[in-house]
């Protein structure tokens, strides 16, 4: 078993994307490779074909590796639902809510489960690409950190250290990280990868020499900043995303606003909208007049009742009511769907203190949060026009309709099993709708229907979505700037 670990000098340095590229590079070489991340902290999750919840990044990496995603690829998933707490998903199933103090007070049970999953993956595949978490040198948590060097040790994996030059301070990132690590951890780092370089790489040759001389570790590559692929991000809305942009929406484009909740989840639902020609997508946190926007989307949330109270405090409720009266389209996905209804009840304290919170009353539905989470990949058709739709469901709520509304989707399969069910509702004028389907905008016919609600002159672009080619494009880009011969020698050593 030959493994490779990809660690970072900090969060958001590009570990997930580099790991994704390596999964595809190794798969293209005919290697049976799979991704692994012992613990992920993210509200951006996905559902495996057998109905387990893992981080979205590991779903993407499994696709790049051409293997079926499983719960073992991300055995511990922390989904923040307050500023200091999170829901713990263990090997694909939600098991508890924990404060940060409680969780980190004793990580041994979580580590044992993670290493159990690691052993199963090692038995099932020839190679693992192991992604670390955050900075691999958080010394205040080092003795409790089982995601980075303890996992690398358990898998006997050499480590590539990824640093982000785009944010500045790359020398301090690398040399500082290496200098604080204990000798046995430093000895496991076999190479450095400088990520997101802009400009003429030849001008960084002195920088490479400086890094190698002062860290004692070879630089395996300098990867230029690259926008030529569309791959889901891991944790939160990417740092380069502008929230509350200045200026007004472009009158020459279809303009869509996504409300940026404090506990926003599954923001990758909207990546496909951003890539559409003639469409602009803005994330809005602070309440503002919605003039110039054709649609507003309420995304998923890991704390629906808390986020709807925040929405009211920010002044969004009256803005949305005005937008509705003026004929704007309002959509809700998962938690956003629940918010559009009349009420959200939490009798079991799933998201915190038990209670009931009034919704926005834009759809005649009511939601009750349950103790068991619904996890499935689903397919169906739009009610009325038969357009094919697909998505994945991750929710604690059960939502029922108590008034005059049209069904949105007829669900035909869940996790590959035939069903006869309905999901979502919309108003009779089709201006307000909600669904539990994450990823539904990835369904072309539904996406085109949505755009036609916003602009009668909309015509679909000729660009086709090809995720597999995106992975190949990413792999080619990284491989072109990485010393693969040296990397393979490190792995085989």
UniProtKB/Swiss-Prot annotation:
Active-site residues, Swiss-Prot/TrEMBL = 334, 438
Alphabetized InterPro entries for the sequence: Class_I_gatase-like, CobQ/CobB/MinD/ParA_Nub-bd_dom, CobQ_GATase1, CobQ_N, CobQ_synth, GATase_3, P-loop_NTPase
Listed NCBIfam families: cobQ (TIGR00313), PRK00784.1 (NF001989)
Q: What does this protein do?
A: Catalyzes amidations at positions B, D, E, and G on adenosylcobyrinic A,C-diamide. NH(2) groups are provided by glutamine, and one molecule of ATP is hydrogenolyzed for each amidation.
Task: Identify this protein by name.
Answer: Cobyric acid synthase
Report any Pfam family annotated for this entry: GATase_3
Q: Which organism is it from?
A: Prosthecochloris aestuarii (strain DSM 271 / SK 413)
Pathway assigned to this chain's UniProt record: Cofactor biosynthesis; adenosylcobalamin biosynthesis
- GATase cobBQ-type domain ranges (all copies): 253-446
Q: Does the keyword Oxidoreductase apply?
A: no
Q: Name one GO biological process term.
A: cobalamin biosynthetic process
Alphabetical keyword list? Cobalamin biosynthesis, Glutamine amidotransferase
Q: Which family does it belong to?
A: Belongs to the CobB/CobQ family. CobQ subfamily.
Q: Does the keyword Ribonucleoprotein apply?
A: no
Q: Which GO terms describe its molecular function?
A: ABC-type vitamin B12 transporter activity; catalytic activity
């Amino acid at each position: 078993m030959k493994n490779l670990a990809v660690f970072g000098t900090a969060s958001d340095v590009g570990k997930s994307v580099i790991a994704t590229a390596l999964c595809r590079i190794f798969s293209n070489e005919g290697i049976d490779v799979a991704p692994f991340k012992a613990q992920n902290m993210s509200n951006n999750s996905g559902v495996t074909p057998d109905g387990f919840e893992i981080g979205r990044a590991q779903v993407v990496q499994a696709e790049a590796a051409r293997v079926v995603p499983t719960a073992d690829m991300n055995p511990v998933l922390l989904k923040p639902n307050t500023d200091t707490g999170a829901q713990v998903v263990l090997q694909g199933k939600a098991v508890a809510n924990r404060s940060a103090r409680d969780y980190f007070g004793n990580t041994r049970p979580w580590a044992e489960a993670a290493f159990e999953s690691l052993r199963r993956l090692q038995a099932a595949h020839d190679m693992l690409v192991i992604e670390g978490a955050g900075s691999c040198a958080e010394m205040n948590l080092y003795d409790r950190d089982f995601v980075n060097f303890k996992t690398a040790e358990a898998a006997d994996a050499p480590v590539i250290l990824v640093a982000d030059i785009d944010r500045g301070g790359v020398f301090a990132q690398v040399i500082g990280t290496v200098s604080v690590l204990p000798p046995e951890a430093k000895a496991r780092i076999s190479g450095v990868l400088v990520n997101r370089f802009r400009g003429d790489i030849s001008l960084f040759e002195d920088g490479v020499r400086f890094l190698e001389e002062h860290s004692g570790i070879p630089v395996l590559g300098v990867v230029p900043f690259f926008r030529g692929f569309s791959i889901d991000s891991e944790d939160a809305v990417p740092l380069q995303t502008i929230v509350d942009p200045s200026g007004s929406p472009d009158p020459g484009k279809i303009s869509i606003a996504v409300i940026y909740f404090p506990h926003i989840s599954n923001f990758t639902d909207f990546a496909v909208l951003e890539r559409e020609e003639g469409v602009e997508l803005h994330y809005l946190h602070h309440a503002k007049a919605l003039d110039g926007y054709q649609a507003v989307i309420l995304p998923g949330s890991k704390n629906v009742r808390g986020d709807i109270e925040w929405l009211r405090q920010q002044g969004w409720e009256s803005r949305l009511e005005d937008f509705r009266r003026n004929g704007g389209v309002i959509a809700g996905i998962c938690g956003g769907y629940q918010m559009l209804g009349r009420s959200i009840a939490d009798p079991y304290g799933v998201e915190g203190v038990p209670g009931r919170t009034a919704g926005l009353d834009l759809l005649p539905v009511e939601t009750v949060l349950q103790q068991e989470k619904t996890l499935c990949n689903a397919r169906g058709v739009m009610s009325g026009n038969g357009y094919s739709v697909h998505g994945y469901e991750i929710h604690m709520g059960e939502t029922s309709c108590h008034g005059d509304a049209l069904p949105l989707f007829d669900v035909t399969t869940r996790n590959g099993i035939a069903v006869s069910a309905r999901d979502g509702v919309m108003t009779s004028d089709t201006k307000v709708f909600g669904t539990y389907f994450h990823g539904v905008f990835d369904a072309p016919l539904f996406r085109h229907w949505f755009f036609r609600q916003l602009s009668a002159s909309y015509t679909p672009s000729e660009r086709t979505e090809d995720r597999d080619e995106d992975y190949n494009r990413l792999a080619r880009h990284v491989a072109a700037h990485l010393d693969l011969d040296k990397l393979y020698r490190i792995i085989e050593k």
